[in-house]
Amino acid sequence: MTTVLGIETSCDETAVAIVNNRRICSSVVASQIDLHKRYGGVVPEEASRQHLLTINPCIEQALQTAKLTWNDIDGIAATVAPGLIGALMVGETAAKTLAMIHHKPFLGIHHLEGHIYATYLSEPDWKPPFLCLLVSGGHTSLIHVKDCGVYEQLGTTRDDAAGEAFDKVARLLNLGYPGGPIIDQLATQGNPKRFNLPEGKVSLPQGGYHPYDSSFSGLKTAVLRLVEKLKQEKTEPLPIADLAASFQETVARSLTKKTITCALDHHISHIAVGGGVAANSGLRNHLQEAAKKRNLTVHFPPLKLCTDNAAMIACAACDHLKKGHISSWNLGVQSRLPITEVMTLY
């Protein structure tokens, strides 16, 4: 049995958790949403300062909630890539310091691998190989999960990530931050078929379109032009709910098509979804319905495990530690690192 304390500070949540194999002993998340809401997005310097203020109380709370001492901890992990450099450094420095003081191995964890491992926390018997649709504010990827640390990226976004597109459209409609949950809520009150918006397609040099890659910048521009047109017409109040529903419908439909096509082309029968956009009701409904028609299994983590948390980081670290993967004390943080290069962290 392996018990790991994990730390996640890659963006705007300070999170600490203790996981025993695939069982959560404690999970603490201090969100900074209210702090960044006034700016309409995450301010890196503010995020780093807030992490510094909250990291130690979060660590203490995680230990107290789990009713464990440092003697019960087998390893200490932190997200080291990708993310905001200053924010990552807070978690990495805290983890390394604790590991040195308490003579524990240190493990640097890839943030996207953490989102993949969120599936294991709610489905402990889930095993590779499977396809993971990872959709968040910074990433939109289709990843073939072959084993711990062994990943093949089959699809990605060529511009905006799905979550980023939600935030930008929400800002365009003056809905506030973060945009994803607000648009999702409004979409339930709107008509998703009122506006015909374009699905982003990525052209190939030899002709045709990439079957798995996404593009959301064109969709975002289409919403902008539609809003400008509706404002000029002034025939009625701006139909915010219908716009939100039509936008969400287009994103969910596009991601579902690419995910199902990718799974079938690669003969993968199990699909997991991770990242903040995995909480979106439109995506959940579309993907579950499409998977059922094709006799594919699809799993969405509980909502609390879709957004950034440290339990997923600790869970990934448990598997790496059991395989003897330990990071060097000289390991630094990186703003970018492909998921295929996870093993360079050990």
Curated annotation (Swiss-Prot):
**Keyword annotations of the record:** Acyltransferase, Cytoplasm, Iron, Metal-binding, Transferase, tRNA processing
Q: Which Gene3D superfamilies match?
A: 3.30.420.40
Reactions accelerated catalytically? L-threonylcarbamoyladenylate + adenosine(37) in tRNA = N(6)-L-threonylcarbamoyladenosine(37) in tRNA + AMP + H(+)
Positions of substrate binding? L134, V135, S136, G137, G138, D167, G180, D184, N280
What EC numbers are recorded for this enzyme? 2.3.1.234
* Gene Ontology BP, a term: tRNA threonylcarbamoyladenosine modification
Locate the residues binding Fe cation: H111, H115, D308
One GO MF term attached to the UniProt entry: iron ion binding
Where found in the cell?
Cytoplasm
Cellular component per GO, a single term: cytoplasm
As to how many cofactors bind and how, the note says: Binds 1 Fe(2+) ion per subunit.
Requisite cofactors: Fe(2+)
The record, for NCBIfam families, names: gcp_kae1 (TIGR00329), T6A_TsaD_YgjD (TIGR03723)
Give the family from UniProt.
Belongs to the KAE1 / TsaD family.
Q: What does this protein do?
A: Required for the formation of a threonylcarbamoyl group on adenosine at position 37 (t(6)A37) in tRNAs that read codons beginning with adenine. Is involved in the transfer of the threonylcarbamoyl moiety of threonylcarbamoyl-AMP (TC-AMP) to the N6 group of A37, together with TsaE and TsaB. TsaD likely plays a direct catalytic role in this reaction.
Q: What is this protein called?
A: tRNA N6-adenosine threonylcarbamoyltransferase
From the broadest rank down, the organism's phylogenetic lineage runs: Bacteria, Bacillati, Cyanobacteriota, Cyanophyceae, Oscillatoriophycideae
